[in-house]
Amino acid sequence: MSANDKIGVAVVGVNGRGGEHISEFLRDDRTEIRVIVDVDEAVANRRCDDIEKKQGLRPKPVSDMRQAFDDDAVDIISTATPNHWHALTGIWAMQAGKDAYIEKPVCHNVLEGTALIAASRKYGRMCQVGTQCRSSKAIIEAVAFMREGGIGEVKLARGLCYKRRKSIGARGDYAIPATVNFDMWSGPASLTDPRCTRPNFHYDWHWQRHYGNGDLGNQGPHQTDIARWGLGIDTHPSRILCYGGRLGYQAERKDDKYVDAG
């Protein structure tokens, strides 16, 4: 396959899960990574260096995703930005004629999800969201076995995940890395004061309301998706149960409530 026949790819947000997107595209002979988008200049250049060693061509590093969407060499985009950017990234990409793959969760809130669907239909572009669990051979086979009656009638599914994690620590006023374009990183979110309230800038946005969705939007999509997949459910829930308690780490909080929702 010649370079002209390959599908041109732009990966948006490459510090964490975006690195896995890069790895998968590099394994596929049909694709060529042509643009890397990240608001952290150091991260973008590091990824471009690694890609050049593996595919020969060095992608163009940019901090503004709109440059990738305007690039005729780009056919598709995948994005693994913080959650608050997911919907707008997909909508802008489809407006520019690109198909879009969005890392879970597909959006920061439900209204953004409906806007993505509307954009996909309006511009005639593909928009997909997924998790690595959907591509896991073991999980695929387990779900098929269960749905074929392998363990009898299933009436209840519980999504559980146990991981050894450090405390997210106390809220505070933490420094933003000098190589980060914070205005671009914040994008459609409201600016807060202090701007960064957790110590690990490139991960702790999960615990900041304007950018993430807590663990419900971080680990939650994996467990809820597998449960719904296994049960064959394709409708929205009609009831929600909440329960809580302060468990494990005693990070600083202004309230005394810890709530799980399911």
Specify the residue positions occupied by each region the protein language model found.
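N-terminal Rossmann-like NAD(P) cofactor-binding module of classical short-chain dehydrogenase/reductase
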Residues: 76-78
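N-terminal Rossmann-like dinucleotide-binding module
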Residues: 1-54, 133-136, 227
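Core domains of carbohydrate- and sulfate-ester-processing enzymes
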Residues: 158-202
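Conserved SAM-binding strand-loop segment of SAM-dependent methyltransferases
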Residues: 59-64
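A structural signal for well-ordered alpha-helical segments within the folded catalytic domains
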Residues: 19, 87, 91, 114, ...
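Beta-strand-loop-alpha-helix segment that lines the small-molecule cofactor/substrate pocket
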Residues: 82-83, 87-135, 149
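Basic phosphate/pyrophosphate-binding loop/patch that engages nucleotide-derived ligands
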Residues: 118-125, 141-156, 174-176
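Rossmann-like dinucleotide-binding domain that binds NAD(P)(H)
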Residues: 183-262
